[in-house]
Amino acid sequence: MRHVQAELSPSSEPEAGPSQPPVRQGTLQGGLLMGYSPAGGATSPGVYQVSIFSPSAGASEPPRALKRPAPPTEGPRELKRGPGLGAREGLPPEEPSTVGLLSPEGLGLGLGVASQHFSHHGLCVVEHGGNTTSPWTSGTQSTPWLSSNASFNTLHTRDWAFPDQGGQGCLGETPGPAPSGQLHTLDTDLHNLAQIGGKSPVARVGNGSNPWPRESHGTANGHSPEHTPPGPGPPGPCPTKRRLLPAGETLDVSSEDEGPAPRRRRGTLGCPLAANSSDAKATPFWSHLLPGPKEPVLDPTDCSPMGRRLKGARRLKLSSLRTLRKGPGLLSPPSASPFPTPAVSRTLLGNFEESLLRGRFAPSGHIEGFTAEIGASGSYCPQHVTLPVTVTFFDVSEQNAPAPFLGVVDLTPLGRKGYSVPKVGTIQVTLFNPNQTVVKMFLVTFDFSDMPAAHMTFLRHRLFLVPVGEEGNASPTHRLLCYLLHLRFRSSRSGRLSLHGDIRLLFSRRSLELDTGLPYELQAVTEAPHNPRYSPLP
């Protein structure tokens, strides 16, 4: 590395020629030490190192100006191209040379420390302000020392780019004669980095914004933030802060630290977009938050008395139709009772018997504990089974007249085929009360040998009390119904006969007491459908 050291001379006249500065003993005086290292050869970028020495703040020696003779007469100095720039444009690459030039303002400001080191790798510092005449180009005496608060605009550029000023192009073009203030490749206003007062390391350019965060000169490694060679971002640990340009202002292309700010969409809300969407397929979990259907517009005729009467009549008609279709028994939940309850409708059938069997009376209560034992005999004897019986009683009169009980035996626990019986034989059904006492034993004889496959039919077995001697001639008005057993039969596709569905029973809760002294006896009557006798399965 080659060094060029400049110190303040006690004489006010410039020296006759370039000479080595004397080495002073004792206190170090103010001066400037410049050096250049080719690093990797002529083709690799060099490193410029500038050391500014200044007396301490308490030094009593007044500041002195430095004068140097003008360099030999030469043409207008062109801006130095960076290594590799000429090769890209078809020009031969230039040899890097040791260039360390001072402006007269470089030594005019005292620093608060003994020395400051500035190392620039591929960095070009160009002066934008301060229209002063350089003593090296004009040969005149340098200007007096400026005050410490004097500010000069400096521009740091990377990749050897140069801003367009006064119609000049970039360094890639052939530059014309540059102003005297721009002939220096190193502006000595770099010492403004160490100034106290919160000034930016790079002077404000154009709009006066500060692209780098302010940082103290005492860093962790004891060097200035500018000691680190410039990289893709600004020097220092802080990331680059981009600014947003106001409307109507264009971006300053001369600043490398401020890139194009991202555009912010106006009118966007902080809430997510999906909150304003109505796509129920994409976001089904918030569909309940959507507004419900609009209320129907009221017809003006509904406010009139006639409209209200018509509306009420229509509601009553719809309610009655629903009641007839479903039945009152279906309106209650099925879990309200542990046993099945026949559907009840207010519409009665032709006689009292049919109305009870089909559940057209509303039940007054239920009795639990009844059981029924079912058996059959014939060509074979199936195993007897015992099933619970659901018993329901009714209140059908106001004179406390006896009303029969309705018992329902559900055959569903036996399976889909029901209880298998022979085609010709006898069925025995024994009813037990909660005390396991026999209430009634029913014996029914049947013959369904001519029943085709996949058909169904039923048998209704009744027990009447009739006067003795009138068994065959007893009128229906003289018969009293005591017990009833209703059985349903079905033949499978293979021809097997079985009981299916349920078994319904009617029985009295106490013995019938007759007022007359005529003797009565029980008469059994078994009936089956006649036309047709068998019906095909649905």
Swiss-Prot record:
Classification via InterPro entries: Atos-like_C (IPR033473), Atos-like_cons_dom (IPR025261), ATOS_Transcription_Regulators (IPR051506)
- Span list, region Required for macropage invasion: 348-430
Here the segments flagged for biased composition (Pro residues) are: 227-238
Chain residue ranges for the region called Transactivation domain 1 (TAD1):
436-444
For the modification Phosphoserine, the affected residues are S254, S255
Supply the Pfam families for this chain. Chromosome_seg (PF13889), DUF4210 (PF13915)
Subcellular locations according to the entry: Nucleus
Q: Which GO terms describe its cellular component?
A: nucleus
Q: Where do the record's region annotations for Disordered lie?
A: 1-99, 165-185, 199-270
Q: What is its main location?
A: nucleus
Q: Which UniProt keywords apply?
A: Nucleus, Phosphoprotein
Give the family from UniProt. Answer: Belongs to the ATOS family.
Function description: Transcription regulator that syncronizes transcriptional and translational programs to promote macrophage invasion of tissues.
User: Per the record, what about its domains?
Assistant: The protein contains a transactivation domain (TAD) which may be required for transcriptional activation of a subset of target genes.
User: What's the protein here called?
Assistant: Atos homolog protein B
| Organism the protein comes from | Mus musculus (Mouse)
The organism's taxonomic lineage, starting at the top: Eukaryota, Metazoa, Chordata, Craniata, Vertebrata
